[in-house]
């Protein structure tokens, strides 16, 4: 029996056609809402759904590329305080974390979740490039500039 999966399950991904035994297909997959029986009507529905998905995918990819360009033009600046101890070592107080970077990006009007930004714990001064996952395989390089004020 051929069925069209409409949800991801152990047998395959959604929107794929698989061959299963008659009992498994009708009693489990179709009954539980994981699949539809394969016929001309459902085949046309699948083709329409796949064309809609590809059109939506292209739209999302285009907007992600635009967002990548905007992010790569941005530069975030942070100031950290430091002091010099008796042994002439520089002790930096605080650090720039992923949470700080996400908050700054949200203030600038970007809509990103905390998992989109590479986990960081920046203490050293200078310009750092941070990876921001904009869309599946599209990664932007965000400039983070850290300035250390010595007291």
Curated annotation (Swiss-Prot):
It comes from the Bacteria. Pfam families: Ribosomal_L9_C (PF03948), Ribosomal_L9_N (PF01281). Binds to the 23S rRNA. The keyword Phosphoprotein does not apply. This is Large ribosomal subunit protein bL9. InterPro entries: Ribosomal_bL9, Ribosomal_bL9/RNase_H1_N, Ribosomal_bL9_bac/chp, Ribosomal_bL9_C, Ribosomal_bL9_C_sf, Ribosomal_bL9_N, Ribosomal_bL9_N_sf. GO terms for molecular function: rRNA binding; structural constituent of ribosome. It comes from Mycoplasmopsis agalactiae (strain NCTC 10123 / CIP 59.7 / PG2) (Mycoplasma agalactiae). Keywords: Ribonucleoprotein, Ribosomal protein, RNA-binding, rRNA-binding. One of its GO terms (biological process) is translation. Gene3D superfamilies: Ribosomal protein L9, C-terminal domain, Ribosomal protein L9, N-terminal domain. The lineage of its organism: Bacteria, Bacillati, Mycoplasmatota, Mycoplasmoidales, Metamycoplasmataceae. NCBIfam families: L9. Belongs to the bacterial ribosomal protein bL9 family. GO terms for cellular component: ribonucleoprotein complex; ribosome.
